[in-house]
Swiss-Prot record:
Residues 126-185 bind DNA. Residues 1-38, 189-252 are annotated as: Disordered. Gene3D superfamilies: Homeodomain-like (1.10.10.60). This is Homeobox protein DLX-3. Its main location: nucleus. It is found in: Nucleus. Residues 20-30, 199-208 have a biased composition (Polar residues). Keywords: Developmental protein, DNA-binding, Homeobox, Nucleus. GO terms for molecular function: DNA-binding transcription factor activity, RNA polymerase II-specific; RNA polymerase II cis-regulatory region sequence-specific DNA binding. GO terms for cellular component: nucleus. Pfam families: DLL_N (PF12413), Homeodomain (PF00046).
């Protein structure tokens, strides 16, 4: 028994000396495994307390099998299923597939059906009320139709705002007008663009017919009195004999002052005038 105890104490002293010697390298995880397997009399807990890590690291990539050139043997790398993000990624992909499957197709916008009313036991669709256009609106629409049979969106919006109509009403009027124009053209009747829309247009109202703007005559103007030409002789004026006395007398006789002087003087004025001249 004494020999066994001395052997054990000597082996312990050798291990302690080799562990504390400054010339030897520090023990690693492989050394721990070596001591834990071969040192049967000591528990691994004594060696774990002296290490910086509480437990040995489980290496998936052993250093002696790792090769930078990718020449490591099979089984060196763990399969992709063991990656921590693999499961969540696959779950997300499954979620996307299920979400796309659950998504409903886009529904097509359907126009509302017209209202149906029972008349005499039979269903009858109620038509929308016809648009009543005024004579001014019809004249403006017809005038614009003469310029262009098709309107762009800005032009249609501007015309509707000017006439107080909606863009739909303007569009429908132009559609009806084009169809009627084509129908008359096919029948060989070239429609005159200058005719009044009140008598020919089916969309016209029942107001009394008014002349179109483009056909209306300008208001009659009051004729200005023209100066009557003075009577003159057939011979030119420069051929007449110039008589200064006659010309001056004629001119003087035509003035209002001459008319007053030609009036007869009242009685007694002659003596007064004679006295004035005598005093002077």
């Amino acid at each position: 028994m004494s020999t066994i105890l001395t052997d054990l104490s000597s082996s312990l002293s050798c291990h302690a000396a080799s562990k504390d010697s400054p010339t030897l390298p520090e023990s690693s995880a492989t050394d721990l495994g070596y001591y834990s397997t071969h040192g049967g009399t000591h528990s691994p807990h004594d060696y774990f307390q002296s290490q910086p890590y509480p437990q040995p690291i489980n290496h998936h990539y052993p250093y002696h099998q790792f090769n930078l050139n990718g020449l490591g043997g099979p089984g060196t790398y763990s399969p992709k299923s063991d990656y921590p993000y693999g499961g969540s990624y696959r779950q997300y992909g499954h979620y996307r597939e299920s979400a796309m499957a659950v998504q409903e197709p886009v529904s097509v916008k359907e126009e509302p059906e017209p209202e149906v009313r029972m008349v005499n036991g039979k269903p009858k669709k109620i038509r929308k009320p016809r648009t009543i256009y005024s004579s001014y609106q019809l004249a403006a629409l017809q005038r614009r139709f003469q310029k262009a049979q098709y309107l762009a969106l800005p032009e249609r919006a501007e015309l509707a705002a000017q006439l107080g109509l909606t863009q739909t009403q303007v569009k429908i009027w132009f559609q009806n007008r084009r169809s009627k124009f084509k129908k008359l053209y096919k029948n060989g009747e070239v429609p005159g663009m200058e005719h009044s829309p009140d008598n020919s247009d089916s969309m016209a109202c029942n107001s009394p017919a008014s002349p179109p703007v483009w056909d209306s005559n300008p208001p009659s103007r009051v004729p200005h009195p023209q100066a009557q030409p003075l009577p003159h002789n057939s011979s030119p004026s420069y051929l007449e004999d110039y008589n200064p006395g006659t010309t001056m007398n004629r001119t003087w006789r035509g003035t209002p002052a001459a008319a007053q002087l030609d009036a007869p003087y009242p009685s007694g004025t002659g003596s007064v005038l004679a006295g004035c001249w005598w005093k002077n």
